[in-house]
UniProtKB/Swiss-Prot annotation:
Source organism superkingdom: Eukaryota
Record's miscellaneous remark: In this alga, in contrast to plants, the small subunit is encoded in the chloroplast. The basic functional RuBisCO is composed of a large chain homodimer in a 'head-to-tail' conformation. In form I RuBisCO this homodimer is arranged in a barrel-like tetramer with the small subunits forming a tetrameric 'cap' on each end of the 'barrel'.
Keyword terms: Calvin cycle, Carbon dioxide fixation, Chloroplast, Photorespiration, Photosynthesis, Plastid
GO term, biological process aspect, one: reductive pentose-phosphate cycle
Subunit note: Heterohexadecamer of 8 large and 8 small subunits.
Protein name: Ribulose bisphosphate carboxylase small subunit
Species annotation: Olisthodiscus luteus (Marine phytoflagellate)
């Protein structure tokens, strides 16, 4: 099951040339670009690990792609995404985010149903990868 988080998630994986174009677009808008990674693909896992130091003042797309490739080298089976942050007053939020690497195999999720008080039923989504393996060895 292909994880669909962020922009371009329904499209085929981006090439490095396409990633450079997206980085250039983000930088042309004045956004800071950062690299994040995780091995926990849960949809509510909004806090991925920041790769290295924030790249707030980096204006060279090839330097950012270098950081992406270093993250790929050390996390070959993890999810890696680029996040563009708009620091403009009144916005101060992520303006774009997209996955630039994913594991070769994405096992997907299962739905757990729990009966609660009365006739209430609660549903929880769990990742097969997280359920099977500890953090750091999920893929």
């Amino acid at each position: 099951m292909r994880l669909t988080q962020g922009a371009f998630s329904y499209l085929p994986d981006l090439t490095d040339a396409q990633i450079i174009k997206q980085i250039d677009y983000c930088l042309s808008r004045g956004w800071s670009v950062g690299v994040e990674w995780t091995d926990d693909p849960h949809p509510r896992n909004a806090y991925w690990e920041l790769w290295g130091l924030p790249l707030f003042d980096v204006k060279d797309s090839s330097a950012i792609l270098y950081e992406v490739n270093e993250c790929r080298r050390l996390n070959p089976e993890g999810y890696i995404k680029l996040v563009a942050f708009n620091a403009a007053r009144g916005t101060e939020s992520s303006a774009s985010a997209f996955i630039v690497q994913r594991p070769k195999s994405e096992p997907g999720f299962y739905l757990e149903r729990t009966e609660a008080e009365g006739r209430m039923i609660r549903y929880t989504i769990h990742s097969y990868a997280v359920a099977r393996n500890p953090e750091g060895s999920r893929y």
